[in-house]
């Protein structure tokens, strides 16, 4: 076989022309210490704060401390098999979570990985967990109500779409029950609900998933779970991940409700990480920026302006207090960040008033603008009447003889307190709340025994539903109590009361 030297030369020239001289550079470092979910890495000269790092065994980490000669990282997975001397690579990205419609009805962890055994999540869209909050220009004022279905809240402490309303109270006062009822009440209202469980028991999360599934609420809900068994870094990331998932829907013009249960455990997880990274401790051993971790999370809740799609993200953070102490560090921080708080009291809870809302110190700073006019008309004096009742009840304990007017107020107060009680998993539509509260506030219950109030309420709603169905529809549509509606309503109440008193 005869090969000409020119042919060989041309083949070699072609191969040289084809050759692409590309050098792939990776910022890498060496582990000098690992343990307790944190690691120190030497090298990583171009590392950024919050950057996602690749450790051996498919474990990821996040850079938090950028020091002169090393980088302090937290591990977002199991540290088994990771040892001193291993190579760590920088990714140039920050932590992202999958977002999209595919997440609805699913249970995921802080990194968006499925936990419910229903197979992988089919979405190719991701979003960084840390995003800048919408600016003042991008927002509009809170002007639409978010109905919780709970009489005590929708009447006196109304919540608007895009608001941040803190739910605060001791353990076992019904904080989670209150938010689950709120989620159940969003059925058919085109609101996507996200429940973020931080440091909860796995059994508690499983119970919540079962409840929402049974009630048909998982069709519009997402659960982000980071249980007590997860590491502190994963618990720390959970609320930010949930918030990013919610923002995706908000940016599409949808309404989203997100619950953080609870931020006390979130602060404890951050404190654990900070102390392990040897950051200087401050008050109650929390690091100096513990206020900032909550403020930057809750500032992402917003009602967007029409130009930006008009979507909203309403946040209900939960804080657990110790012996009702709302002056502790984390409770005061979160109270100052949010637009109001609902305070739940163990004394009220134990005395049978559930939901155990203390109307005296609970407040909604912006929700009043969002409350429907019909509810405003009905409950204008409700808070004042309850306050007067509490004062009189305390005075009456001393057995003093009360005048006729005071006795009347006392009796009315008892009935108002009774009417505000509500069973769990039974949220009420706003028009039904208006009917019930109108009855109570306008003295239609004065001749009904206190112990019969619950029965009266249930049967009155059934009666109105059967004989005056258009009344509820009118209130829901017009959102205001016209003289015509009031007259019809009073006729219905008087008619039913006659029947009820005859049966009694």
From Swiss-Prot:
The record marks 362 as: Required for activity. Keywords: ATP synthesis, ATP-binding, Cell membrane, CF(1), Hydrogen ion transport, Ion transport, Membrane, Nucleotide-binding, Translocase, Transport. PANTHER family: ATP SYNTHASE SUBUNIT ALPHA, MITOCHONDRIAL. One of its GO terms (molecular function) is ADP binding. It holds the Pfam family ATP-synt_ab_N. Produces ATP from ADP in the presence of a proton gradient across the membrane. The alpha chain is a regulatory subunit. Belongs to the ATPase alpha/beta chains family. It is found in: Cell membrane. PROSITE patterns: ATPASE_ALPHA_BETA. It comes from the Bacteria. It is a peripheral membrane protein. F-type ATPases have 2 components, CF(1) - the catalytic core - and CF(0) - the membrane proton channel. CF(1) has five subunits: alpha(3), beta(3), gamma(1), delta(1), epsilon(1). CF(0) has three main subunits: a(1), b(2) and c(9-12). The alpha and beta chains form an alternating ring which encloses part of the gamma chain. CF(1) is attached to CF(0) by a central stalk formed by the gamma and epsilon chains, while a peripheral stalk is formed by the delta and b chains. Signal peptide: none annotated. Its main location: membrane. GO terms for cellular component: plasma membrane; proton-transporting ATP synthase complex. This is ATP synthase subunit alpha. It catalyses: ATP + H2O + 4 H(+)(in) = ADP + phosphate + 5 H(+)(out). InterPro entries: ATP_synth_asu-like_sf, ATP_synth_asu_C, ATP_synth_asu_C_sf, ATP_synth_F1_a_nt-bd_dom, ATP_synth_F1_asu, ATPase_a/bsu_AS, ATPase_F1/V1/A1_a/bsu_N, ATPase_F1/V1/A1_a/bsu_N_sf. Its EC number is 7.1.2.2.
